[in-house]
A protein has these predicted regions:
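Non-catalytic, conformational "gating/processing" segments within enzyme and secreted inhibitor domains
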Residues: 74, 114-277, 298-381
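Bacterial N-terminal signal peptides
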Residues: 10-19
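Exposed beta-sheet edge/beta-hairpin loop segments within beta-rich domains
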Residues: 200-201, 384-391
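Extracytoplasmic/secreted cell-surface and envelope-processing proteins
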Residues: 99-103, 281-283, 314-316, 367, ...
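Short glycine-rich loop/turn motifs
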Residues: 55, 256-259, 354, 393-397
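Internal alpha/beta scaffold segment
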Residues: 276-299
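Detector for small/aliphatic-rich hydrophobic stretches
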Residues: 2, 8, 21-172
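C-terminal or internal capping secondary-structure element at the end of a domain, subdomain, or sheet
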Residues: 393-416
């Protein structure tokens, strides 16, 4: 039997920052301009919908809804499903057979070939940074290759063409590569994520590390005034700084929750917050179809908003979750088929993501790093009056691109 080697596919992070842009103008007034049109074909729109289905399914697996008060309660969490999509999309060019089919199915791309997925990824990577001159968006990919191994030329070409990732060959045993990868992560997240690996996670005998970074920096289209932030009760026992403003925002309601949509910059990106109408740790995660329904139902409404200022960091181990979602072969040293990736048989030994978010009066800053270790081998009408949206209890939030509806980040905040 051929022993398969470890391939670390590191998707180091996805970074989002919605803060004041680095310019000399001290004014808090947002600079706005009309959004660039993101033109998607019918099949590309379907790819977005399927990708969002993966996003919500993934978060549902990571943050399971408790069945009773005796079950573990949800914790603060944030993930970037889009980062995982890019990392696995790039790696899937090296997969074959059942392994490739399973990855495609989990990502929601089962009816599409890798060429369609590659074309969609490169289109989003090229277009997203152009949607709003006030908002900085970067999507970057990279590959570090152990000098002891060689990649399949066709995979290398696709990585360059569709993901702007050119393999860099290094001696993984030189004691420097881990720091090089960490520095790359730091450079592409404005230092939000400076360490990709926990102690002992970097493997000198790994075949390769594949990395993806998504960075977003902007500001609320309607910032909060710092002087209006007051300490108030969050939940039943915790006091937190609560930001406050009354303004027009996107708003709707479902039977169980209020939904607020707050735009960044010129409105190309927004945060959508799902707030249960009562304190409810059993809040369900929406499906992609429900996400579409909510976006169609949202109307501009005058809303009195209270939102906590918070920061959350999540380090999520993804091997078990992704295997449970339907791609077990990729993690199995005997079944994995990445014959189009490397001349040496490989499998995924570790897949993880580190994510971080900061939310304050100016906007939102977030980052996520995903690491995959491959081893060898019904909506109600919107009220017309001023609506109270006081997020003083656990809530779900989604950061998305508005024209396509593509989900960049999903998080849950339950308090400190």
């Amino acid at each position: 039997m051929i022993q398969k080697r470890t391939l670390w596919v590191a998707i180091p992070f996805v970074m989002m920052a919605a803060v004041m842009t680095g310019c000399s103008d001290d004014s808090d007034a947002p600079y706005t301009t009309d959004p660039v049109v993101l033109e998607l074909t019918r099949s590309e729109k379907e790819l977005v919908n399927q990708s969002n289905e993966f996003a919500f399914n993934l978060f549902r697996k990571i943050i399971p809804v408790p069945n009773s008060w005796s079950d573990p309660m949800p914790q603060n969490a944030i993930i970037s499903p889009l980062s995982i999509t890019y990392a696995l999309g790039m790696l899937n060019n090296g997969a074959a057979g059942e392994t490739q089919e399973q990855i495609n199915k989990v990502l929601g791309f089962g009816n599409y070939g890798t060429d369609s997925i590659n074309a969609f990824c490169v289109k989003m990577m090229r277009t997203a940074p152009q949607l709003d001159p006030q908002t900085k968006v970067m999507i970057a990919n990279n590959i570090y290759l152990n000098k002891s191994y060689k990649l399949i030329p066709e995979f290398v070409q696709k990585a360059k063409t569709f993901y702007d990732a050119t393999p860099e060959t290094r001696d993984f045993a030189d004691g420097k590569t881990e720091n090089v990868i960490n520095q790359w992560a730091s450079d592409h997240t404005e230092r939000m994520i400076q360490k990709v690996f926990k102690d002992g996670q970097f493997m000198p005998d790994a075949v390769s590390y594949l990395l993806n970074a998504i960075y977003f920096k902007g500001m609320w289209a309607s910032p909060f005034e710092v002087q209006n932030t007051k300490d108030e009760l969050f939940g039943t026992t915790t006091t937190m700084p609560m930001m406050h403003q009354t303004n027009t925002f996107g708003y709707t309601e479902t039977t169980d929750c209020q939904v607020l949509q707050m735009p960044y910059g010129n409105g190309s990106f927004a945060m959508t917050i799902f707030l249960p109408k009562d304190y409810n740790p059993f809040q369900e995660i929406p499906t992609a179809e429900e996400w579409q329904q909510v976006n169609r139902a949202i109307r501009t409404t005058m809303v009195d908003v209270k939102l906590p200022r918070f920061e959350t960091t999540t380090d999520t181990y993804l091997n078990y979750v992704m295997s449970e979602m339907g791609m077990p072969d990729a993690f199995d040293s005997e079944k994995a088929n990445f014959s189009n990736f490397c001349y040496t048989p490989t499998y995924i030994g570790l897949m993880k993501q580190v994510a971080k978010i900061k939310l304050d009066e100016k906007g939102t800053e977030a980052a996520a790093v995903t690491v995959i270790d491959m081893n060898l081998t019904a909506i109600e009408p919107t009220p017309s009056q001023i609506v109270e949206f006081h997020a003083n209890r656990p809530f779900l939030y989604v950061i998305s691109e508005q024209q396509s509806g593509a989900v960049f980040f999903i998080g849950k905040y339950v308090g400190e």
